């Protein structure tokens, strides 16, 4: 049995038994990792707080060769993004980000770029408009996946130029791209279409965003 350590983002957790949970992580070094966290439901669980969605953690896990589920040994919080610090709109987008990452991340694959992108967007969400960050996030996920088409084939020349420029910026600079509300909406429709086409389904959280915002 090999033991691994990596920075990670907690993506999702769901019950496995009365006291255990299966947890999905995006790790910096090993891609998507699914593992069992034992004793999570106990009052003094060592995992307290670290399994909340999109928590930045230092993860230690072990796994036998050819075993699908790892065993989560330790999960230390580096940075949390608790729901009470954000509006309901931001929290809804966070749920969307989690679902995107579950779908696009791959197991046993280096995910340095995807991890850095995700963490930067989460950190910027404390200061910048969440809808603009969501577009930046979607565009880069599609690009990293290799399924982002030439923008001038999908957008007007002016908007394609703006979006190309935005993607060259650091996430903290996205507002300087100068996208109008109408342009953001057009970009949202395009990203939603591209994600849905690639995954061959519409994400549940995308439906909620469309209905509520």
Name these PLM-found stretches.
Residues 1-21, 26-213:
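Non-catalytic alpha-helical scaffolds and adjoining flexible linkers that form interface surfaces
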């Amino acid at each position: 049995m090999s033991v691994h350590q990596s920075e990670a983002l907690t993506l999702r957790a769901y019950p496995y038994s009365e006291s255990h949970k299966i947890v999905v992580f995006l790790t910096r070094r090993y891609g998507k990792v699914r593992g069992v966290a034992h004793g999570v439901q106990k009052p003094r669980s060592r995992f307290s707080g670290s399994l909340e969605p999109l928590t930045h953690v230092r993860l230690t896990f072990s796994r036998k060769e050819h075993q699908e589920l790892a065993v989560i040994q330790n999960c230390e919080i580096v940075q949390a993004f608790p729901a009470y610090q954000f509006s309901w709109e931001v929290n809804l987008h966070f749920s969307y980000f989690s679902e995107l990452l579950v779908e696009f991340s791959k197991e046993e694959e280096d995910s340095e770029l995807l991890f850095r992108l995700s963490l930067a967007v989460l950190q910027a969400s404390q200061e910048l408009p969440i809808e603009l960050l969501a577009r930046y996030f979607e565009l880069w996920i599609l690009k990293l996946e290799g399924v982002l088409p030439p923008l001038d084939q999908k957008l007007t020349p002016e908007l394609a130029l703006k979006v190309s420029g935005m993607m060259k910026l650091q996430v903290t600079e996205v507002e300087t791209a100068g996208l109008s509300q109408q342009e953001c909406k057009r970009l949202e429709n395009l990203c939603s279409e591209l994600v849905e086409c690639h995954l061959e389904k519409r994400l549940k959280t995308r439906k909620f965003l469309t209905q509520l915002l």
